[in-house]
Design a protein with these regions (language model features):
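Cytoplasmic loop-to-transmembrane helix junctions
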Residues: 73, 162-169
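Central cavity-lining transmembrane alpha-helices of secondary-active solute carriers
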Residues: 76-94
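C-terminal ends and interior cores of transmembrane alpha-helices
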Residues: 110-126
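Conserved kink/hinge residues within transmembrane alpha-helices of Major Facilitator Superfamily
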Residues: 52, 56, 88-93, 148
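Hydrophobic core of transmembrane alpha-helices in multi-pass small-molecule transporters
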Residues: 115, 129-145
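Cytoplasmic membrane-interface "Motif A"-like loop-to-helix N-cap segments
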Residues: 98-109
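Extracytoplasmic
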Residues: 36-69
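Intracellular juxtamembrane helix-capping segments at the cytosolic ends
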Residues: 145-159, 167
Length: 170
């Protein structure tokens, strides 16, 4: 997405011209598009936050359903999504310019189904090894990385004077 002043070309859903700092453009077209992207991003991040924090709710209940993990192992399962999320934030912040905001938001939100479904199967079998839970926990960290790409995406759409409010809602 460029901040160019070149004439707009019809190219389907791809934005070829974006001038959020131009008040006329912002009123006529920009605000509507920016708001739509913000309101799509907010529920995607809500879902991401739920997946990211999933193990904080699951870990305390694993011993109650028959898993024999130590307290240290349970704390590790709770901490690993934060670790992988922090490490993945750097590459995720570069994905929006590479793939586009809508594509990346859809993809990065969609892949969160993998750790959720896998965890759903894993907790049903008390013989599931701890190493499997480690992998699932690390995959939940992908949800934490979504925040970096979402901030990069939404900041492109809003003029400087409105970015604080938009990013605060996001």
């Amino acid at each position: 997405m460029s901040h160019s002043s070149a004439p707009e070309r019809a190219s389907g859903a791809v934005i070829t011209e974006w001038r959020p700092e131009d008040p006329v453009f912002w009123q006529q077209r920009g605000q509507r598009i920016a708001s739509r992207n913000l309101w799509i991003s907010v529920p995607c991040l809500l879902l991401a936050f739920c997946v990211w924090m999933l193990f904080s709710a699951v870990a305390v209940n694993l011993p109650k359903v028959g898993f024999n993990f130590t307290t240290e192992q349970l704390f590790m399962l709770t901490a690993l999504p934060s670790v992988s999320g922090a490490l993945l934030r750097v590459p995720y912040s570069f994905m929006v310019p590479l793939f586009g905001g809508r594509r990346w938001t859809a993809f990065s939100t969609g892949i969160l189904i993998v750790p959720c479904v896998w965890l759903g199967f894993a907790v049903q079998d008390t013989t599931t090894p701890f190493s499997t839970f480690i992998i699932i926990s690390l995959l939940c960290g992908f949800a934490g990385a979504n925040f970096a790409s979402s901030m990069a995406n939404i900041s492109f759409f809003f003029p400087k004077q409105k970015q604080g409010g938009a990013l605060g809602l996001n």
